């Protein structure tokens, strides 16, 4: 369960849009507002700062339990996550300690926050670094690689959401004595409950190790 401020980009999950909200104010007050406001956002010719923020009239989305399903996109494969070369141009062996870094798309620790949910899809980039000591013969090089087993999945999620709060509208001339009016979300939206859906490209990387290759002459 979570609670966050509603945004205009969330309205599609409620079968609504900024035009839906503007039309509701037009029906209620008999004239079309210049702009509308939702929390810290405005739309059309809105008053700045948005009146919902200025007058403390928030609108929230309450999220329920997330339903998650996954689909395998590929069988587990050995992948090289990163590599570095230790080079010795001298005439005697040297021992080097250096880091090898692997950068890969990994969803193993992704967080299904509301901000990720509303975007529809996401992937998470992770970086792994390991240090290794390598002895390199004279006039040779040794390649050190970070390898791991990668399994790619597509994760589908659905999050029920309900909405409660206010929208605002500003008018170019006074309406019933005021330039600003507020309406409850129930009067502005086609519905105040829905399901946010999306996908996340998800790659599990496991059994990460560092491999030192054979020395090669320069």
Swiss-Prot record:
Q: Where in the cell is it found?
A: Secreted
Residue ranges of coiled coil: none
Q: List the disulfide bonds.
A: none
**What CDD domains is this protein classified in?**
parasporin-2-like_N-term, PFM_parasporin-2-like
- Entry's Gene Ontology molecular function annotations: toxin activity
Q: Which Gene Ontology terms of cellular component type are present? A: extracellular region
What keywords are assigned to this protein? Secreted, Toxin
Organism superkingdom = Eukaryota
What this protein is reported to do is described as:
Does not induce flaccid paralysis when injected into blowfly larvae and lacks hemolytic activity.
The record's similarity note reads:
Belongs to the hydralysin family.
> What is the protein name given in its UniProt record?
Hydralysin-3
From which organism does this entry originate?
Hydra viridissima (Green hydra)
């Amino acid at each position: 369960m979570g609670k966050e401020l509603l945004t205009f980009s969330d309205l599609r999950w409620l079968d609504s849009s900024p035009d839906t909200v503007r039309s509701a104010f037009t029906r209620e007050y008999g004239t079309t507002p210049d702009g509308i406001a939702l929390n810290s956002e405005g739309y059309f010719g809105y008053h700045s700062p948005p009146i919902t923020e200025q007058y403390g009239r928030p609108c929230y989305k309450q999220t329920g339990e997330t339903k998650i399903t996954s689909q395998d996109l590929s069988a587990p494969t050995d992948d090289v996550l990163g590599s570095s070369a230790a080079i010795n141009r001298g005439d005697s062996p040297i021992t080097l300690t250096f880091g090898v870094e692997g950068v890969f798309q990994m969803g193993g620790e992704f967080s299904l926050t509301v901000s990720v949910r509303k975007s529809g899809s996401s992937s998470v980039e992770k970086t792994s670094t390991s240090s290794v000591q390598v002895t390199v013969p004279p006039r040779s090089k040794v390649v050190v690689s970070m390898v791991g087993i990668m399994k790619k999945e597509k994760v589908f999620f659905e999050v029920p959401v309900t909405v409660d709060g206010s929208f605002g509208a500003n008018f170019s001339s006074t309406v019933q004595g005021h330039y600003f009016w507020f309406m409850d979300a129930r009067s502005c939206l086609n519905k105040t409950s829905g399901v946010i859906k999306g996908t996340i490209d998800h790659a599990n990387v496991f059994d990460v190790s560092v491999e030192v290759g054979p020395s090669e002459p320069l």
